[in-house]
């Protein structure tokens, strides 16, 4: 099943938690750096803290096959063509973008496979009935990611630092 490739899992330790939005965003960024290294072997020097851009927070619910569904949180980080996600924090997803050239050293206990794709390639993959995607990844992509991705090089500022939580 294809999905985002990194889950940050912020820990209840100094530096990865916060009592207000700016501190929480900073904590998510630090956790993302830690887990990018753990899961994908991306060293934090390749994904500098200050290069992460906070866009918004979301709270989502994704029904599945009628028997199972999902109602939890994912933080999602996106590079130009590498999609990375982080996980649960205060039951709200934090959406961060980072554009970086990275070297991968995959932790096979965490990640089965990776694929760099363009926006058009990802849209084509979604149409392939033989491929399966996690519900949260597809929901975020179809409702917001493609719009943001189109503005990654110019105009992304209008999407950054949202104060409201989007309900999905």
PLM regions and their residue ranges:
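Nudix hydrolase/Nudix homology domain
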Residues: 2, 6-7, 13, 53-168
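Generic detector of short, locally flexible boundary/turn motifs and exposed helical patches
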Residues: 19-21, 40-43, 78-82, 88
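A short coil-to-beta-strand element that immediately follows conserved catalytic motifs
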Residues: 43-55
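Conserved Nudix-box catalytic region and its N-terminal flanking loop in Nudix hydrolases
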Residues: 1-42
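Alpha-helix capping at helix-to-loop junctions
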Residues: 37-45, 60, 101
């Amino acid at each position: 099943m294809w999905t985002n490739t990194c889950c940050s899992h912020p820990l209840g330790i100094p530096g990865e938690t916060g009592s207000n939005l700016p501190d929480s965003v900073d904590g998510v960024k630090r956790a993302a750096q830690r887990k990018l290294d753990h899961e994908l072997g991306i060293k934090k020097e390749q994904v500098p803290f200050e290069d992460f851009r906070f866009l918004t927070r979301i709270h989502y619910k994704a029904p599945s096959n009628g028997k199972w569904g999902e109602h939890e949180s994912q933080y999602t980080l996106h590079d130009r063509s590498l999609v990375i996600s982080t996980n649960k924090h205060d039951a709200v997803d934090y959406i961060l973008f980072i554009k970086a050239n990275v070297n991968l050293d995959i932790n096979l206990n965490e990640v089965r496979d990776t694929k760099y794709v363009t926006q058009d390639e990802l849209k084509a993959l979604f149409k392939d009935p033989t491929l399966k995607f996690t519900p949260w990844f597809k929901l975020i992509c179809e409702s917001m990611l493609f719009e943001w991705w189109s503005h990654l090089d110019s105009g992304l500022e209008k999407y950054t630092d949202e104060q409201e939580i989007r309900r999905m």
